[in-house]
Amino acid sequence: METNKLYECTLIIDGGLQDEAIAAAMALVQRVITEKGGSISSVLEIGRRKTAYPIKKKTIGYYAHIEFTAATSVIAEVEKVIRYEEDLLRYLIIHLTSALLEMRKRVEKYSVVIGSPEDSALAEAAAASDTVAK
């Protein structure tokens, strides 16, 4: 029996579609993962963004990330279904190793969101140190 591993699937769905069609494409991917024996741990829908370059003559994409656990044999079956879905512009499935998870924890620990109270405190501290140095 294969052991389940943690994966992340990043999707770019055609941003020109109606919200119902985007929801249907997301539901399709999630359904395929669960039907093939995987279990979804988190879904992060980022929303519509401008792409860096045209993909299939589209410049707006709907970005989403799905974290799931599945056996390695499931990935090929999921990719087979995703590959032929016309509404999906791009997809990438990666195996989340312990090194990647550790790096993600460090980034979350030390990152500061611009405009947050922590960011304001850092900016004030930097300004105070600049005036003291002069």
Curated annotation (Swiss-Prot):
Q: Which InterPro entries match?
A: Ribosomal_bS6 (IPR000529), Ribosomal_bS6_sf (IPR035980), Ribosomal_S6_plastid/chlpt (IPR020814), Transl_elong_EF1B/ribsomal_bS6 (IPR014717)
What UniProt keywords apply to this chain's record, in alphabetical order? Answer: Ribonucleoprotein, Ribosomal protein, RNA-binding, rRNA-binding
What molecular functions are annotated in GO for this chain?
Answer: small ribosomal subunit rRNA binding; structural constituent of ribosome
Which residues are the signal sequence here?
A: none
List cellular component terms (GO).
Answer: cytoplasm; ribonucleoprotein complex; ribosome
Q: Name one GO biological process term.
A: translation
The UniProt entry, under Pfam families, shows: Ribosomal_S6
Do you know which Gene3D superfamilies this protein is assigned to?
Answer: 3.30.70.60
**In which family does this protein belong, per the annotation?**
Belongs to the bacterial ribosomal protein bS6 family.
> What is this protein for, i.e. what is its function?
Binds together with bS18 to 16S ribosomal RNA.
Q: Which HAMAP family does this one have?
A: Ribosomal_bS6 (MF_00360)
Q: What protein is this chain from?
A: Small ribosomal subunit protein bS6
Biological source species: Pelodictyon phaeoclathratiforme (strain DSM 5477 / BU-1)
Kindly list the organism's lineage: Bacteria, Pseudomonadati, Chlorobiota, Chlorobiia, Chlorobiales
This protein's encoding gene: rpsF
